[in-house]
């Protein structure tokens, strides 16, 4: 049986991978959005693990709120990405300063 430490290590590894993904790739908007989603997944893994091992369902309920916010964040991020690609024909983060007014 897996202990709480196993799930926390998994969450920490996922979080570290997402941090590395953001810092190593600062140009592509899609990769940055995927890394942020992975970061939220790592946090949700820790919430579910603590909720299960403490016998409380509040952590699992909170995961649904985090998933809702993550879905809204992904939708807004992809909308910005589509706007960027339509106006500039690129998805580089460095070109975001050209989207004015």
Curated annotation (Swiss-Prot):
<comment type="subunit">
    <text>NDH-1 is composed of 14 different subunits. Subunits NuoA, H, J, K, L, M, N constitute the membrane sector of the complex.</text>
</comment>
<keyword id="KW-0997">Cell inner membrane</keyword>
<protein>
    <recommendedName>
        <fullName>NADH-quinone oxidoreductase subunit K</fullName>
        <ecNumber>7.1.1.-</ecNumber>
    </recommendedName>
</protein>
<keyword id="KW-0813">Transport</keyword>
<feature type="transmembrane region" description="Helical">
    <location>
        <begin position="30"/>
        <end position="50"/>
    </location>
</feature>
<keyword id="KW-0472">Membrane</keyword>
<keyword id="KW-0812">Transmembrane</keyword>
<dbReference type="GO" id="GO:0042773">
    <property type="term" value="P:ATP synthesis coupled electron transport"/>
</dbReference>
<keyword id="KW-1133">Transmembrane helix</keyword>
<keyword id="KW-0874">Quinone</keyword>
<feature type="transmembrane region" description="Helical">
    <location>
        <begin position="4"/>
        <end position="24"/>
    </location>
</feature>
<dbReference type="GO" id="GO:0050136">
    <property type="term" value="F:NADH:ubiquinone reductase (non-electrogenic) activity"/>
</dbReference>
<keyword id="KW-1278">Translocase</keyword>
<keyword id="KW-0520">NAD</keyword>
<dbReference type="InterPro" id="IPR001133">
    <property type="entry name" value="NADH_UbQ_OxRdtase_chain4L/K"/>
</dbReference>
<dbReference type="Pfam" id="PF00420">
    <property type="entry name" value="Oxidored_q2"/>
</dbReference>
<dbReference type="GO" id="GO:0005886">
    <property type="term" value="C:plasma membrane"/>
</dbReference>
<keyword id="KW-0830">Ubiquinone</keyword>
<dbReference type="GO" id="GO:0048038">
    <property type="term" value="F:quinone binding"/>
</dbReference>
<feature type="transmembrane region" description="Helical">
    <location>
        <begin position="61"/>
        <end position="81"/>
    </location>
</feature>
<comment type="function">
    <text>NDH-1 shuttles electrons from NADH, via FMN and iron-sulfur (Fe-S) centers, to quinones in the respiratory chain. The immediate electron acceptor for the enzyme in this species is believed to be ubiquinone. Couples the redox reaction to proton translocation (for every two electrons transferred, four hydrogen ions are translocated across the cytoplasmic membrane), and thus conserves the redox energy in a proton gradient.</text>
</comment>
<dbReference type="InterPro" id="IPR039428">
    <property type="entry name" value="NUOK/Mnh_C1-like"/>
</dbReference>
<keyword id="KW-1003">Cell membrane</keyword>
<comment type="similarity">
    <text>Belongs to the complex I subunit 4L family.</text>
</comment>
<dbReference type="GO" id="GO:0030964">
    <property type="term" value="C:NADH dehydrogenase complex"/>
</dbReference>
